[in-house]
Amino acid sequence: MIKYDFDRKVDRVSTNDMKWHSKAVSSYLNCDIPEDMIPMWLADTDFACAPVIVNALRDRVEKEIFGYCAPMAPFYSAVCGWQKRRFDWDVKPEWITFVPSVVASINIAIRSFTNEGDGVIIQQPVYDPFATIVKNDNRKVVNNGLVHINNEFKMNLEELEALAAKPENKLMVLCSPHNPVGRVWTKEELTAVAEICLKHDVLLVTDEIHADIVYEGYKHYPLLSLDKRYEENFILLTAPSKTFNVAGLKASMSIIPNKELREKFEHTQKAMSLDVRNTFGLECVSAAYTDEGEEWMKQE
């Protein structure tokens, strides 16, 4: 087993780094940030990237050509293999659509399956872009707020049932595991949400970008893996961005088993000019989702 050095300091100066650059942070957050700040505002790690990814990108650079690209067999087999090894979920290559980011996928889904004025259910407190996207798309934010009980956040399923029953609420975005409260939803909680959405014909889109970052004693369940009906009716979004700290490579996957939903999603994706692929993003996914990438991820 290779021993990786997570204690080596990496100099991020002159890397176009957003996290540590005070002027960039000040502009993004619209406030004054001192130059000696300690940035804890962004989900971005400060140790070196996994060598398997670095080496794959280095090898790709050596080919000295960077034209238009498309996902090939190694990309699809890597994604399918990762889901099988990590979560025992059998994903078919044709279910997978490459998208620059999970946030972009949420935007595409909202525009594909709702109309202006429709309600989109989210569970605040949640990742800020969820609400921002809904508002920017001229949809209504419908908050099924989490409740804090005995030092733990829980879902208000009774309220969710009532909100889902309203015909104007067409779609729900679930964060699983939840950002920022950190809950890893149980199989029972996920099933309850899915059944409510199925019952009331609400399209459930699940953001599972943090699926790999789960403490010992807890288990992440890909929502679509829990029931064949969920595969046919819902959408799962994932990416290596948080696991391997590669958000700058702009690579994520929408997993949509239902062909009709997938084709509608991809039609909107093209209309929004979000069907572009990043050469290095494809290489990153193919390298990260390997045994070597998993070994790096698991090291304590």
Sequence positions of predicted segments:
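Alpha-helical elements of Rossmann-like donor-binding domains used by nucleotide-donor carbohydrate transfer enzymes
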Residues: 52, 56, 78, 155, ...
